[in-house]
């Protein structure tokens, strides 16, 4: 139990408790006042006795003498008792008690003498100094210091220090010291008597936070909720204030310029965690609170007054009011009035009547108008003002209207307060400069506000830029930037006499460009685009964009040299490049170019317009939209088509969008509008589509017969054309699906997707729908341009022309019917009058119609074979000879074109034991024409990949007879090459040379220079013109097909050529002369 606790127990009246030190000190003080002249030894004995009594009090015993002293102290009254812990200076407190109680003071005077009074006065004057010196010497606890001749004063000082340590608590000692030095100013203690005269800056140093002050803790907060969170924590603090567990934070700080953080003042981090617990806005800072260093704590609350340094002709913007966000130029600055005189474009409502023209009706109309209607910014027009009743007065060089001053050029000059303008980092756009100045060349683009937060943002210079000095003695000196340090630029001069780097301010330099440089736009309307500089002016640079080939006018400060080419922006918000958008209720368009603020939209009329994103609505398309091309083929999105008529005739492209009778196409070879153009669907032709016309469809569908040239699969178009006639009797233009190729992996060997690999999703006789592996895109491809991966042979090995042998008149004797049954079972051929046994036709008793081995070759299928001469476009021999002929021998079951085509029927492919007809061929009249067409019967031979005339022994891989002849025809033809017409029906054309303009399905459009016209000629009538030394050529065969080069020399059967800066040897027949430029 401590001494103070024992003292408290004795004060409460306990008889058995120990006597407090306070009572002992009171008793000793009284005895000392009565016998102050006692010897040093008596004091030592008293001090020893006091310590022994204190030790006895800790054990709980009490001597009779101490009880007597306690009784004497009790007699003096309870008001004379001192509170525990304040008897550090007993004499000082005794005198205070004497002032309050004269009776005690009289007792002190009764026993005092002259020498004692002097000692007491001396003690009162030097009491603090003695205590201070004693404390410094003994360090408050001086029990182990040897007493080397101590005086009475030294002993008393030691006694006081000992009592201070033994009897008082730490907080009581701290309170005593604070009271003792409270009357002395901090400045006086640190700086002596002259501290009061110190400056405020020096005295403020003493108020800086120290290690004993609360710390600042930085807590992450939700951005924008800093002040609201601080108020929330204040309410939480007040709520917990009267509870058992109040919050231990001292303050909350949410500085104005700090985003995403607040500061809490507290002694410990745990106090901060308790405070921010369950606060949603501080969820991000729950696990991490960063303590601010002591030296940086003052910077949190430091307020720096910004000095506005405006310059004349500096660009600024208005913050509020009618001219909010408008560009303005500083005319002069009035710092005394805190105002700035600006020059800007006025906003005057020329529709509101003024003066005498203002009537009651106009006032009522004005009240109905929107209050915050903002007129357009344009130069002041005095004539327009007078027209609405306004009065314009002249004041020297200015015009006065409604209290405002206008220049003769139409600009408004007006005073604004400093707080109403924004001057930091203002950069006017080129459009604003053109409207702001009558002559843009006079505009000073370099005067603008600087950004104080980041000095590097005050300029757009970067390493390696070419600059020139614009002010000073070295004006017009060209240099190259080698280092940048804030606003200080280090450059290497381009001068023979200057070899050392020079340092300039950023305001003293400007960028320098020359014609032919490749640069990137850093800011403005065309930000991110690259192009080639074609013209340099003092205040602007003109360059051609790499993406659009349009001229761009850019400020020099917004350019930077670069070597790469921009890829462009393909999306902005909800819109992307190539999207179809709704312009109005009747018109649509396609986005062909995206800029920062505007879209370039290609309309239905083929014109490109600029639109704001807010004025457009994205149109939702149906992916199943279908239209008809010029040949009445169905076309849909992603189909590859060719333009046959109109301004874009000859171009090929992919359908991006279909809208009513219009199609938006994308062509990689078209440079304008991003490669997108619009055409009418009736001007298009599907790549690989049918050429069946409406007139032919009617004839074929009704009669079922066509000429051999059209009907025979020898010609690809003929085979496709016969499809309508064969289906005419049962549903007209029904499309036959080729299920045998579905799901197979193929490779495209021609067209715009040459080399692509995909899976066949759907197929007809002429077209296949292929899903590409690379882009998962489904496209339509001509069947002649695909080859099955893993199958040897040329493309077209999967033939569509041989599935119905009856369609080929030349093979009627070899393959009697659609199936092999006609040649194997005579009963069928002799008893079945038609395909279906239940078909009761008037022709049932006629010659068997399906047993082709008993009829002439063409008799069963084409009544015109022996009567009408056929065209000789497809064969070297003549078809005009009467039947029988060497080319068409009706007595021979096979096709006697050449020996390499051995006769074979489709039945042998499927294990037929008898693949020929047992009946000998005999001439018989052709059957009467049937009024309807024929349907394919589902049999294996219907989808036979091998047809007559195409056996594996042939050098042509299994394919249709027509494909075997036409497989190599027209493959070499391409555009912009010179060709010679070696054969043609028109003898006047034979021998002429021309230039191929377009190629479509083996038909070339050739421009004849002699006749100055274009003719359409089948590619088989053309021959390439060989180049000579020095001529440009184009490769027409091989892996490098379509490559362009120049002939250097000829060495036998090869040419020495230069292609892309490489020297190569190429065969003669691989090259064709390109068109010569006259």
UniProtKB/Swiss-Prot annotation:
Residues 64-75 have a biased composition (Basic and acidic residues). The keyword Repressor applies. Residues 350-461 are annotated as: Interaction with RNA polymerase II. Residues 1-22, 814-852, 886-907, 954-967 have a biased composition (Polar residues). Residues 213-307 are annotated as: Interaction with Spt4. The keyword Transmembrane helix does not apply. Pfam families: KOW (PF00467), KOW1_SPT5 (PF23042), KOW2_Spt5 (PF23284), KOW4_SPT5 (PF23291), KOW5_SPT5 (PF23290), KOW6_SPT5 (PF23288), KOW7_SPT5 (PF23287), KOWx_SPT5 (PF23037). Keywords: Activator, Chromosome, Nucleus, Phosphoprotein, Repeat, Repressor, Transcription, Transcription regulation. Residues 76-99, 117-135 have a biased composition (Acidic residues). Phosphorylated. Phosphorylation by P-TEFb alleviates transcriptional pausing. Phosphorylation by P-TEFb alleviates transcriptional pausing. Dephosphorylated by the INTAC complex when transcripts are unfavorably configured for transcriptional elongation, leading to premature transcription termination: dephosphorylation is mediated by the mts/PP2A component of the INTAC complex. SUPFAM superfamilies: Translation proteins SH3-like domain. GO terms for cellular component: DSIF complex; polytene chromosome; polytene chromosome interband; polytene chromosome puff; transcription elongation factor complex. It is found in: Nucleus; Chromosome. It comes from the Eukaryota. Residues 718-732 have a biased composition (Gly residues). One of its GO terms (molecular function) is protein-containing complex binding. Residues 309-336, 460-487, 513-545, 635-668, 740-773 form the KOW domain. The modification Phosphothreonine is found at residues 162, 808, 815, 825, 847, 855, 867-868. InterPro entries: KOW (IPR005824), KOW_Spt5_1 (IPR041973), KOW_Spt5_2 (IPR041975), KOW_Spt5_3 (IPR041976), KOW_Spt5_4 (IPR041977), KOW_Spt5_5 (IPR041978), KOW_Spt5_6 (IPR041980), NGN-domain (IPR005100). Gene3D superfamilies: 2.30.30.30, NusG, N-terminal domain (3.30.70.940). The modification Phosphoserine is found at residues 73, 76, 90, 707. GO terms for biological process: negative regulation of DNA-templated transcription, elongation; negative regulation of transcription by RNA polymerase II; positive regulation of DNA-templated transcription, elongation; positive regulation of transcription by RNA polymerase II; sex-chromosome dosage compensation; transcription elongation by RNA polymerase II; transcription elongation-coupled chromatin remodeling. Component of the DRB sensitivity-inducing factor complex (DSIF complex), which regulates transcription elongation by RNA polymerase II. DSIF enhances transcriptional pausing at sites proximal to the promoter, which may facilitate the assembly of an elongation competent RNA polymerase II complex. DSIF may also promote transcriptional elongation within coding regions. DSIF is required for the transcriptional induction of heat shock response genes and regulation of genes which control anterior-posterior patterning during embryonic development. Belongs to the SPT5 family. This is Transcription elongation factor SPT5. It comes from Drosophila melanogaster.
């Amino acid at each position: 139990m401590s001494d103070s606790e024992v003292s408290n127990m004795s004060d409460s009246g306990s008889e058995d408790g120990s006597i407090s030190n306070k009572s002992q000190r009171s008793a000793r003080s009284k005895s000392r006042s009565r016998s102050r002249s006692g010897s040093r030894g008596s004091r030592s004995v008293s001090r020893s006795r006091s310590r022994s009594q204190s030790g006895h009090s800790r054990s709980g015993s009490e001597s009779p003498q101490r009880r007597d002293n306690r009784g004497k102290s009790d007699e003096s009254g309870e008001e004379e008792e001192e509170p525990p812990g304040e008897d550090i200076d007993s004499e000082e407190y005794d005198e205070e008690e004497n002032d309050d109680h004269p009776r005690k003071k009289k007792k002190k005077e009764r026993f005092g003498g002259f020498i004692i009074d002097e000692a007491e006065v001396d003690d009162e004057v030097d009491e603090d100094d003695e205590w201070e010196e004693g404390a410094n010497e003994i360090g408050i606890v001086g029990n182990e210091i040897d007493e080397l001749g101590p005086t009475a004063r030294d002993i008393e000082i030691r006694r006081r220090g000992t009592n201070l340590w033994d009897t008082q608590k730490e907080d009581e000692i701290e309170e005593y010291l604070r009271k003792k030095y409270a009357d002395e100013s901090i400045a006086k203690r640190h700086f002596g008597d002259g501290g009061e005269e110190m400056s405020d800056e020096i005295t403020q140093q003493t108020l800086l936070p120290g290690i004993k002050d609360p710390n600042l803790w930085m807590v992450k907060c939700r951005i924008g909720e800093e002040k609201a969170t601080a108020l929330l924590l204040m309410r939480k603090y007040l709520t917990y204030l009267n509870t058992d567990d109040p919050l231990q934070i001292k303050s909350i700080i949410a500085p104005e310029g700090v985003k995403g953080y607040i500061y809490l003042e507290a002694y410990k981090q745990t106090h901060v965690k308790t405070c921010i617990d369950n606060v949603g806005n501080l969820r991000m800072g729950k696990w991490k609170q960063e303590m601010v260093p002591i030296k940086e704590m003052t910077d949190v609350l430091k307020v720096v007054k910004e000095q506005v340094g405006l310059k004349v002709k500096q660009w600024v913007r208005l913050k509020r009011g009618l001219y909010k966000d408008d560009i303005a130029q500083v005319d002069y600055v009035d710092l005394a009035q805190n105002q700035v005189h600006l020059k800007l474009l006025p906003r005057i409502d020329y529709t509101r009547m003024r003066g005498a023209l203002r009537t009651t009706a106009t006032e009522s109309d004005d009240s109905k108008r929107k209050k915050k209607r903002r007129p357009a910014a344009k130069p002041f027009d005095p004539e327009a003002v007078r027209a609405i009743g306004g009065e314009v007065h002249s004041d020297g060089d200015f015009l006065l209207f409604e209290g405002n001053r206008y220049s003769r050029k139409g600009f408004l000059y007006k005073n604004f307060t400093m707080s109403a303008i924004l001057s930091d980092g203002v950069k006017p756009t080129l459009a604003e400069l053109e409207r702001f100045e009558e002559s843009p060349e006079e505009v000073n683009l370099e005067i603008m506000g600087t950004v104080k937060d980041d000095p590097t943002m005050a300029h757009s210079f970067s390493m390696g830029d070419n600059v020139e000095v614009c002010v000073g003695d070295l004006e017009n000196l060209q240099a190259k930037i080698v280092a940048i340090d804030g606003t200080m630029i280090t450059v290497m001069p381009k001068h023979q006499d200057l070899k050392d780097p020079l340092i300039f301010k950023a305001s003293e330099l400007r960028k320098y460009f020359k014609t032919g440089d490749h640069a990137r736009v850093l800011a403005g309307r065309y930000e991110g685009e690259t192009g080639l500089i074609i013209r340099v002016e003092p205040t602007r640079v003109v360059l051609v964009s790499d993406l659009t080939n349009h001229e761009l006018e850019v400020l020099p400060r917004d350019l930077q040299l670069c070597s790469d080419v921009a890829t462009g922006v393909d999306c902005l918000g909800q819109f992307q490049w190539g999207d179809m958008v709704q312009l109005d209720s009747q018109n649509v368009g396609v986005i062909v170019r995206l800029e920062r603020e505007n879209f370039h939209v290609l309309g239905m009329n083929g014109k490109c317009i600029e639109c704001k994103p807010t004025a457009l609505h994205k149109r939702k398309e149906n992916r199943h939209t279908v239209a008809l091309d010029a040949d009445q083929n169905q076309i849909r999105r992603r189909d590859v088509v060719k333009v046959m008529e109109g301004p874009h005739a000859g171009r090929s492209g992919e359908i991006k969008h279909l809208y009513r009778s219009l199609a938006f196409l994308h062509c990689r070879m078209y440079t304008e509008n991003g490669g997108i153009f619009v055409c009418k669907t009736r001007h298009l032709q599907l790549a690989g589509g049918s050429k069946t016309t409406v007139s032919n469809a009617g004839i074929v569908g009704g009669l079922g017969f066509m000429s051999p040239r059209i009907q025979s699969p020898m010609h690809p178009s003929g085979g496709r054309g016969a499809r309508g006639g064969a289906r005419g009797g049962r549903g007209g233009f029904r499309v036959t699906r080729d299920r045998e190729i579905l799901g197979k992996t193929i490779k495209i060997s021609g067209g715009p997707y040459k080399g692509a690999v995909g899976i066949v999703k759907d197929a007809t006789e002429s077209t296949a729908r292929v899903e590409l592996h690379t882009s998962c895109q489904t496209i339509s491809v001509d069947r002649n341009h695909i080859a099955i991966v893993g199958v040897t042979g040329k493309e077209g090995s999967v033939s569509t022309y041989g599935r119905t042998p009856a369609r080929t008149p030349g093979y009627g004797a070899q393959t009697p019917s659609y199936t092999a049954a006609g040649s194997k079972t005579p009963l069928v051929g002799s008893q079945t009058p038609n395909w279906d046994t239940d078909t009761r036709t008037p022709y049932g008793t006629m010659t068997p119609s399906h047993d082709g081995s008993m009829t002439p070759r063409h008799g069963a299928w084409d009544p015109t074979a022996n009567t009408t001469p056929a065209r000789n476009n497809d064969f070297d021999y003549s078809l005009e000879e009467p039947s029988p002929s060497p080319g068409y021998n009706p007595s021979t079951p096979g096709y006697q074109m050449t020996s390499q085509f051995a006769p074979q029927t489709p039945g042998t492919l499927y294990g037929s034991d008898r693949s020929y007809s047992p009946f000998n061929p005999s001439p018989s009249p052709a059957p009467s024409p049937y009024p309807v067409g024929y349907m394919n019967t589902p049999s294996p031979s219907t989808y036979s990949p091998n047809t007559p005339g195409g056996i594996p022994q042939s050098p042509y891989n299994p394919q249709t007879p027509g494909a075997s002849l036409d497989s190599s025809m027209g493959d070499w033809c391409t555009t912009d090459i010179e060709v010679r017409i070696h054969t043609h029906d028109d003898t006047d054309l034979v021998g002429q040379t021309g230039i191929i303009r377009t190629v479509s399905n083996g038909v070339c459009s050739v421009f004849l220079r002699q006749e100055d016209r274009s003719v359409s000629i089948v590619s088989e009538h053309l021959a390439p013109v060989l180049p000579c030394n020095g001529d440009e050529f184009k490769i027409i065969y091989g892996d490098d097909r379509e490559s362009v080069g120049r002939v250097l020399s000829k060495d036998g059967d090869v040419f020495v050529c230069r292609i892309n800066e490489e020297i190569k040897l190429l065969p003669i027949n691989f090259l064709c002369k390109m068109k010569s430029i006259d």
